[in-house]
């Protein structure tokens, strides 16, 4: 397992590492499990640079669905890798039709990347070669006869995603409550049920109890958090820079149990203050 990063570049980097360590050229079914907004599409782009997703959070990219057009493919130049978002495609096709298309692609020696794999598994009858769950943590498994089953990953990643969303929103609220100079000086890190703000060179002049009080006041105001573009969110209507704009709670009031460590910790290895 890995802590699921929240910034886009961090997820891309982790995707590349996962591909190098766990992906095999013999894998035909690669299943992803996780709620919308958990970062599955970004992780897939990191694992498979240059892949054209049939759809993502921005809309539909490829139509008709290439997986369902296999019978019309002729000659040498046919796709080797297909992408399939089960939750999205069930709005247009029956699950049984999609399962038949996946089985045909496997027989033809193709590779299929399937989002929301847990929805098609009961009809497919076979598990994925590589099964990845995305929640607060990224869980990577290579199932065998004894499991794990997709539902086991669902039980882990679906409940845990809420902590990741809360941590990311709280992280951005801290930045929002800082001065511009302090915000530009810090970088982000990931820990379980929380976040890390790191400062290089010298300890910042930040009154931590005051910063915590400011953030708790923003939480009490229950400000809406909305997607603006791929690099910004709207925090109570104010534009704020963010590299993971879809990985947030809907409003600040949904952040529960926020608090900050009341002192800085010096990391002697990286020479940073946290």
Predicted regions and their residues:
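Conserved mixed alpha/beta catalytic, RNA-binding, or beta-rich assembly cores of soluble enzyme
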Residues: 30, 47-50, 68-69, 92-95, ...
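N-terminal pre-Walker A segment at the start of P-loop NTPase domains
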Residues: 1-25
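Well-ordered, non-membrane alpha-helical segments in soluble/globular domains
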Residues: 11-17, 93-100, 208-213
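Short glycine-rich, basic-tinged beta-strand/loop micro-motifs
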Residues: 29-31, 77-87, 192-199
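Conserved nucleotide-sensing/catalytic segment adjacent to the nucleotide-binding pocket
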Residues: 55-118
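Glycine-rich phosphate-binding P-loop
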Residues: 28-52
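Active-/binding-site microenvironments in catalytic and ligand-binding cores
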Residues: 148-274
């Amino acid at each position: 397992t890995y802590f699921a990063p929240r910034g886009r570049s961090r997820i891309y980097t982790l995707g590349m590492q996962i591909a190098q360590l766990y992906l095999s050229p013999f894998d035909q079914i690669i299943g992803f499990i996780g709620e919308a907004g958990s970062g599955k599409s970004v992780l897939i782009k990191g694992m498979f640079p240059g892949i054209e997703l049939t759809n993502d959070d921005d809309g539909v990219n490829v139509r008709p669905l290439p997986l369902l057009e296999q019978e019309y493919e002729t000659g040498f130049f046919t796709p080797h890798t297909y992408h399939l978002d089960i939750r999205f495609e069930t709005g247009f096709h029956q699950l049984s039709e999609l399962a038949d298309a996946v089985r045909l692609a496997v027989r033809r020696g193709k590779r299929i990347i399937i989002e929301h794999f847990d929805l098609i598994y009961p009809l497919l009858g076979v598990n994925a070669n590589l099964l990845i769950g995305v929640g607060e943590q990224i869980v990577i498994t290579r199932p065998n006869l004894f499991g794990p089953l997709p539902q086991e990953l669902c039980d882990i990643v679906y409940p845990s995603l809420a902590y990741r969303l809360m941590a990311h929103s709280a992280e951005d609220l801290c930045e929002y409550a800082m001065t511009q100079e302090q915000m530009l000086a810090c970088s982000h890190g990931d820990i379980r049920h929380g976040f890390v703000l790191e400062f290089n060179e010298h300890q910042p002049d930040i009154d931590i109890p005051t910063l915590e009080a400011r953030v708790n006041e923003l939480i009490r105001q229950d400000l809406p958090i909305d997607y603006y573009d791929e690099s910004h969110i709207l925090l109570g209507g104010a534009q704020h820079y963010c590299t993971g704009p879809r990985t947030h709670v809907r409003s600040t009031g949904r952040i529960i149990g926020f608090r900050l460590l009341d002192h800085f910790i010096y990391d002697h290895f990286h020479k940073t203050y946290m």
